[in-house]
């Protein structure tokens, strides 16, 4: 049985459709959920994209009802909570891989652009992670003044900007570069440090700092 294989061999030995079956079993007990698991993967392309899909999109798939959506969203929330716990209130700069893992878990599979700001204290501990804006498939509106204002409200000393590219390609646009420069200037004027701007793609990310863009 799938459950026994999962308990003895772990998820690494299971293909995506079988792991998805285990989740679907909870919503649809005593049903053959393999066809639905494969259908979801065909529609959304990957396990991560299935979990991140909006409820309205999920229910367009034949066989998906409220119970299935609920189970998928519980798993998505649990994965994000676990990844977040590995970076919250920890020195971010020395836990960089954990931070990247969290950003990929939270943002890599989203169908539209999302812009987040990670606020750090004087010891570079992550004190807040907030979504600042949501956009379309290729644009998200960001207001530098609001970002800096929020940093002051939180008594933050440094920032890390993060946004995703639903296309999967993390190459920054000219608008991304210009916006980052505006936030950097606004932050520096108030004594705040902009450590980096991460663009999250599918399976990889781009660091403005590493690319010499900061």
UniProtKB/Swiss-Prot annotation:
Residues 92-214 form the MPN domain. One of its GO terms (biological process) is proteolysis. It holds the Pfam family UPF0758_N. GO terms for molecular function: metal ion binding; metallopeptidase activity. InterPro entries: MPN, RadC_JAB, RuvA_2-like, UPF0758, UPF0758_CS, UPF0758_N. The keyword Metal-binding applies. SUPFAM superfamilies: JAB1/MPN domain (SSF102712), RuvA domain 2-like (SSF47781). Keywords: Hydrolase, Metal-binding, Metalloprotease, Protease, Zinc. A motif (JAMM motif) lies at residues 163-176. It comes from the Bacteria. Induction: Induced about five-fold after UV-irradiation. Zn(2+) binds at residues 163, 165, 176. Belongs to the UPF0758 family. PANTHER family: DNA REPAIR PROTEIN RADC (PTHR30471), UPF0758 PROTEIN YEES-RELATED (PTHR30471:SF3). This is UPF0758 protein. It comes from Rhodobacter capsulatus (Rhodopseudomonas capsulata).
């Amino acid at each position: 049985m799938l459950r026994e294989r999962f308990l003895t061999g772990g998820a690494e030995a299971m293909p995506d459709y079988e792991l998805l079956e285990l989740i679907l079993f909870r919503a649809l007990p005593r049903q053959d959920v393999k066809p639905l698991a494969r259908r979801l993967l065909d529609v959304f392309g990957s396990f991560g994209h299935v979990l991140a899909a909006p409820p309205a999109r999920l229910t367009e798939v034949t066989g998906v009802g409220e119970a299935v959506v609920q189970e998928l969203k519980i798993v998505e929330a649990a994965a994000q909570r676990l990844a977040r716990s590995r970076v919250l209130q920890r020195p971010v700069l020395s836990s960089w891989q954990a931070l990247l893992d969290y950003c990929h878990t939270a943002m890599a599979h989203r169908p539209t652009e999302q812009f987040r700001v990670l606020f750090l204290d004087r010891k570079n501990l992550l004190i807040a992670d907030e979504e600042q804006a949501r956009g379309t498939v290729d644009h998200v509106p960001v207001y530098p003044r609001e970002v800096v204002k929020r940093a002051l409200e939180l008594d933050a000393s440094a920032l890390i900007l993060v946004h995703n590219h639903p296309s999967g390609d993390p190459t920054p646009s000219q608008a991304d570069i210009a916006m980052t420069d505006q936030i950097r200037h606004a932050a520096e004027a108030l004594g705040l440090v902009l450590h980096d701007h991460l663009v999250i793609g599918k399976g990889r990310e781009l660091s403005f700092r590493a690319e010499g863009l900061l």
